[in-house]
């Protein structure tokens, strides 16, 4: 099983492996989950939005912070974060095939199948958010993965992303590789935990256009519609993206009449 598939909670793995549980609404665009899967989605989203209120902190565990400070390497088969940025960037085969580094670059509060990667604890969140060096490294990790997906960050203040020069090749890979959709879920969750919530909305907005308007990333629709929009922490941003989605689908319908 892919590491990223394990990183998602049970509902996401169920979506990945049991597509017959997903039914299309009449317009063919809005995706709906079975009742059981929908409950799992709702519970996980609420845990994330509410900041995992039942999570117990462990002040003795600091591996995520140490990794962000370039003090320890990712494990297994990994490296120090600065080395990853310097030597792995643009090595698409390595970034694709190695399934052990994402849990270190983008830690979240849930445990993963990488037993050598630590879940993110509340005290680490504060330390990473308060440290410019750690923040700069997280932003660089995000830019590296955007490049891997055929994108680049045009504006770090509002999160606007655009296609990179090799977008066609990279989009093709992203469109066909479900585990990369799960990686994006992890990235978005991590950004929201570690001080970069403001980068998420315009990334999602870009993906919606590529799904519904240009149709270059149609296979991302389940993750985007059912999850990514919902893990925007600001209710006004969730509402904005819902309106934007509805407008795109209306434009599609109008173009067919």
Q: Language model features by range: what are they?
A:
Residues 156-257:
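Alpha-helical bundle/repeat cores within regulatory domains of eukaryotic proteins
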Residues 1-158, 162:
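N-terminal leader regions that mediate targeting or early regulatory function
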């Amino acid at each position: 099983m892919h590491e990223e598939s394990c990183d998602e909670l049970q509902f996401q793995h169920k979506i990945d492996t049991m597509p017959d549980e997903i039914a299309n609404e009449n317009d063919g665009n809005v995706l709906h989950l079975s009742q059981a899967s929908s409950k799992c989605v709702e519970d996980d989203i609420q845990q994330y939005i509410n900041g995992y209120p039942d999570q117990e902190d462990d002040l003795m565990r600091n591996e995520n912070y140490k990794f962000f400070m370039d003090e320890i390497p990712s494990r297994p088969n990994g490296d120090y974060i600065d080395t990853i940025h310097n030597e792995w960037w643009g090595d698409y085969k390595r970034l694709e095939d190695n399934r052990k580094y994402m849990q270190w670059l983008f830690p979240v509060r849930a445990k993963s199948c990488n037993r050598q990667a630590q879940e993110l604890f509340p005290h680490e969140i504060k330390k990473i958010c308060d440290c410019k060096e750690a923040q700069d490294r997280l932003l660089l990790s995000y830019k590296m993965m955007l490049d891997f997906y055929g994108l680049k960050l045009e504006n770090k203040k509002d999160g606007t992303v655009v296609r990179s020069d090799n977008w066609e090749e990279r989009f093709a890979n992203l469109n066909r590789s479900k585990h990369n959709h799960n990686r994006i879920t992890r990235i978005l969750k991590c950004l929201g935990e570690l001080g970069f919530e403001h980068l998420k909305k315009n990334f999602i907005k870009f993906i919606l256009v590529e799904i519904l308007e240009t149709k270059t990333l149609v296979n991302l629709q389940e993750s985007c519609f059912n999850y990514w929009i919902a893990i925007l922490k600001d209710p006004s941003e969730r509402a904005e993206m819902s309106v934007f989605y509805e407008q795109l689908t209306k434009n599609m319908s109008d173009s067919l009449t």
